[in-house]
Amino acid sequence: MGTAGAMQLCWVILGFLLFRGHNSQPTMTQTSSSQGGLGGLSLTTEPVSSNPGYIPSSEANRPSHLSSTGTPGAGVPSSGRDGGTSRDTFQTVPPNSTTMSLSMREDATILPSPTSETVLTVAAFGVISFIVILVVVVIILVGVVSLRFKCRKSKESEDPQKPGSSGLSESCSTANGEKDSITLISMKNINMNNGKQSLSAEKVL
């Protein structure tokens, strides 16, 4: 009779708590006598707090075995056994580790901004390399021009020293003079012949 009455009382209390489920959280505790007699069930209700790390006063003194596995920032379920009774508790962990990991990733992705010293060193290196290239090009051009000038001088110095060049020029000039004299003599002969023919014709008339 004692157990039947206790069960009926439990069902009545559970029905009442279903209507007030939004304002209170039921926790069931079971007590057993050490002498092996019949145990009675008792229900206690405690208000639910909005704090995620809130632990009821009835559960504060009981040992709990929390599992070490779980995702950061989410609830970690843990189960414990005390005096033959099983219970499940739900504990929330603040998401500090996730925020720290995100901040570390953002810091790693941010590239260091170039400073004025690095910009100046890069600019100086570019100017120096440009000047060196210009100097090399000027040296090459000066060498090419000097080589051409030397080649021209050597050719001019070799031309007057060639054997037979003066004789050829003199022979060409004498040949030209002889041609001119021959043409003059032939013209004189033609004129003289024409004069003689005209005189003979006049005499005949």
Swiss-Prot record:
It comes from Homo sapiens. The gene is ECSCR. This is Endothelial cell-specific chemotaxis regulator. One of its GO terms (cellular component) is plasma membrane. Residues 25-124 are extracellular. InterPro entries: ECSCR. May be heavily O-glycosylated. Highest expression in endothelial cells. Also detected in vascular smooth muscle, macrophages, lymphocytes, and mast cells. Keywords: Angiogenesis, Apoptosis, Cell membrane, Chemotaxis, Cytoplasm, Developmental protein, Differentiation, Glycoprotein, Membrane, Phosphoprotein, Signal, Transmembrane, Transmembrane helix. Belongs to the ECSCR family. Residues 49-101, 153-175 are annotated as: Disordered.
